Amino acid sequence: MKKLCPLLLILFALYGCVQTSNKANKKFSNVQQENFDNMLARNRDKSYRLGNKILEKEFNDSVKLAIGEYMDSVKLFINWKAKIHNINSMELGESVKLSFELKYTPEQYREVSFDVDYLLSKDSLDSDKIYNTIKRLNNYSTVYFDGFIRREANGEACYSSYSDDIMHSYPNFKFFVVDINTTSKGDILSDNLQYAVNLSFKAIEPLELSFKKKMSDKETKKRIAEIAPQFKTAKELLTQEEKEYVDRLTQALTYNFLYAE
């Protein structure tokens, strides 16, 4: 028994080191944000090992498409943490364009940015959650946000940065924001809201396919007629704040295919 005691102490000490190491290696409490950032870090590391411009272009194009496909898989980023920068607004006729950037810096010499343009009517300035949250913030404030990366017409992720030379170390994505808060709300949506969100993506699909001339008008109307009653019932189960969340999401999803280049 006396021989076992030192051994147990060593094992406990090693276990404690492993636990501490795992926590130290984690950059984010949000698992979804951690996984996405790890993917970006791997892409950055791979980009350093490419031997010529042809390989670089092929790799960069594959990354843009892979991130677009990644967004098809995860649908929404939920409760990600970042600093807000460059808050601004501009009047456009009867609308206001709110613009800002969301940035996080996971390590030295690497920064991830999301470039947001949020359009709303002047009539909704007093009631719109995004606008009223943003206008009370100072630049560099910490925020928690939901949303998704915009995509090009070919399915690639849409970048704001003009040079592929920095797309791995300093990626800057064009982004649709759906929710923003000054405190964490948790990384999981309520069951009712998640169901309505899933239906939102399902409902927008026939509209997008019709817009791209990939679905007939007859099939589009049929698909919409099938989804509409489910969507209506799902929204009736939501709180008012959740209904507004879904409205912002469906608007962003519509803009995503209408203005894809």
Predicted regions and their residues:
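OB-fold and OB-like single-stranded nucleic-acid-recognition modules
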Residues: 19-261
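C-terminal motif of bacterial Sec signal peptides marking the signal peptidase cleavage site
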Residues: 14-16
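Positively charged n-region of N-terminal signal peptides that target proteins for export
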Residues: 1-4
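Sec-dependent N-terminal signal peptides
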Residues: 6-9
